[in-house]
Structure formats: C-alpha cells, structure tokens
Amino acid sequence: MALAGALALGCSLTWAQAPNYAIDPTHTFVNYENGHYGTTTNRGRFSTKDGTLYFDREKKEGKVEIVMDISSVNTGVDFLNRQLQGKDFFNVADYSTGKFVSDKFVFDGDKVSEVHGQLTLLGKTHPVVLKAQKFNCYINPIFKGEVCGGDFETTIMRSQWGVMWGLQFGFEDAVKLIIQIEAIKMK
C-alpha cells in the first residue's frame, strides 16, 4: 500500500545528453497495489510534478528523471489518504516529494524492455528495475509533435524505505508499482 510513492522521480542528474522530452504530468502517474489480510488489494495513485526524458532509439539510449508529489496520494478514501500522508507512512510534512532517476534503458531489439534506476522515498534511495509492458513513440495530433510513453511495472519491498506500519498485523511488505509515463518532445 505504502510504497507506491516509490516512483517519485527527480531532476538532479548531470547528463551528457540534454533531455529532449518533457514529462507530461497529465499522463504520468505512479499507481500501486498492496495486499492486506490475504483478502483484497489496496490501490492508490500518485501524481507527478516534473520530469525529463532523454531518449534515442537509434543509439538505444535513454535516461529519465521524474519528481512525484507524495502528498497527492489518492486511494479514493479521504481517511486513508490522510493516514498515508502521515508519519506512519509517507510523512509528507518532511518528505513531500519522491523521485526516480534512471540512466540505463535496456532494449530487446528495437523495443525498450527495462529501465534501471534509483528510487528515492522518505530520504532513502534504492535501486529498482522497471519492466516495460509497452513503450512507443508517435506523432500526437494535438501537440503536433512526437510523444513517447509507456507502461512499466516493478515490485518493491516497502520496508526497504522504512515504511513498516501494518507489517505485524496483515499488510504485505511487497508493493506492486504500475507506472504510466508520457513525455512530449521539446522543440
């Protein structure tokens, strides 16, 4: 339940290549799923604040930095949202953003298959590997320019980031992250 925020992403890397895409925050979200009591799955979503992408399909290179707004956590239940924002979970008073920074895209032929990076949440940074479910670039008729985007998944252990609440009485440590990302080519 808690570590969906995991994909909080930030802009701090020094890149040899300049970012050539800007993250579209209206199409970029981190969703999470966390089981509890062996019954149902809790789900929620975090919005993104900012981010950049460098992508070169010909060179088979990619880098991404995304900043996530942890205070935007939305489960559809106001009480649970407030609980997740508190000190027992995401402590948004001290850690209002999270970030994901990657400097390695893995390709299978011409397709992006994985994105390796570092996830920072609650001031702790750990490596994660995002598996591409799909990724593509196309000419967007609204923006009249190229947009690249895709869906990625990974499973993390929230205890690595210090989110321990509920582990002793039925909330699972494993959190599945489902990341939707779109980025618009800069002119």
Predicted regions and their residues:
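Low-complexity, acidic/polar, glycine-enriched regions of mature
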Residues: 15-187
